Amino acid sequence: MDILDKLRGGVIMDVTNPEQAKIAENAGAVAVMALERIPADIRAAGGVSRMSDPKMIKEIIKAVKIPVMAKVRIGHFVEASILEAIGIDFIDESEVLSPADEVYHVDKNKFKVPFVCGARNLGEALRRIQEGAKMIRTKGEAGTGDVIQAVKHMRQIQSEMRQLTCLREDELYVAAKNFQVPYALVEYVHKHGKLPVPNFSAGGVATPADAALMVHLGADGVFVGSGIFKSGDPAKRAAAIVKAVKNYDNPAILAEVSENLGPAMVGINEEEIKVIMSERGV
């Protein structure tokens, strides 16, 4: 079983130290994202956000048996090479960090370690896959606790894929031109009705119900960032979100796991956001 098979259908959690990583692992997370500050703190602090300290990442790698991911800035292939050198399992070329390049993303085909990238629509998803991404995630709006953008992006991608399946084959060439990707990628979506890589949800997931909603909308799994360790009872909320993803279509179980979780993260309403991270890297 390769790493993508292990991750599919699961929850990936942001952690900032080995203790949090162990909480995530014990709760049933399929992987953890190692970073010095969770997105809510990155958003609050402002300034330039960069790759995390390799020493901290290595400590988290040692602490858990599940795969460990870490973020690099968009276009920063040197940060990516550093993470590959320390043995990271998966790299997230992330709009949550300050972009290093306004034009180019990392050429992910040159790396052995797999990459995940964010997308708001099918065009962005296919361009990242062309560059070598092995997983796509909705960008959402990280660090807000507001799921509305993740919902918007997932619905957009799913809608555009459904539209592609209805096109005549000769119309696919125009679609490929519009998406700025090779014909073969458009043809794959046309034939299969899905992306050639897993499509996870990220950005604003804060409750078991949020996580279940994203799976209903087509997510192959869920990233949860600030929603766990900014909440009142991280261990209980983490386990509840894992159970919600596995039982997304069972309202009785969802009701059970949603009880007595303590306060959710306070969050930021969409209208209050000053920095729109999801607009980075198209």
Swiss-Prot record:
D-ribose 5-phosphate binds at residues 14, 143, 204, 225-226. GO terms for biological process: amino acid metabolic process; pyridoxal phosphate biosynthetic process; pyridoxine biosynthetic process. Keywords: Lyase, Pyridoxal phosphate, Schiff base. GO terms for molecular function: pyridoxal 5'-phosphate synthase (glutamine hydrolysing) activity. D-glyceraldehyde 3-phosphate binds at residue 155. Its EC number is 4.3.3.6. It comes from the Bacteria. InterPro entries: Aldolase_TIM, PdxS/SNZ, PdxS/SNZ_N, RibuloseP-bd_barrel. In the presence of PdxT, forms a dodecamer of heterodimers. Belongs to the PdxS/SNZ family. Catalyzes the formation of pyridoxal 5'-phosphate from ribose 5-phosphate (RBP), glyceraldehyde 3-phosphate (G3P) and ammonia. The ammonia is provided by the PdxT subunit. Can also use ribulose 5-phosphate and dihydroxyacetone phosphate as substrates, resulting from enzyme-catalyzed isomerization of RBP and G3P, respectively. This is Pyridoxal 5'-phosphate synthase subunit PdxS. The lineage of its organism: Bacteria, Pseudomonadati, Spirochaetota, Spirochaetia, Spirochaetales. The gene is pdxS.
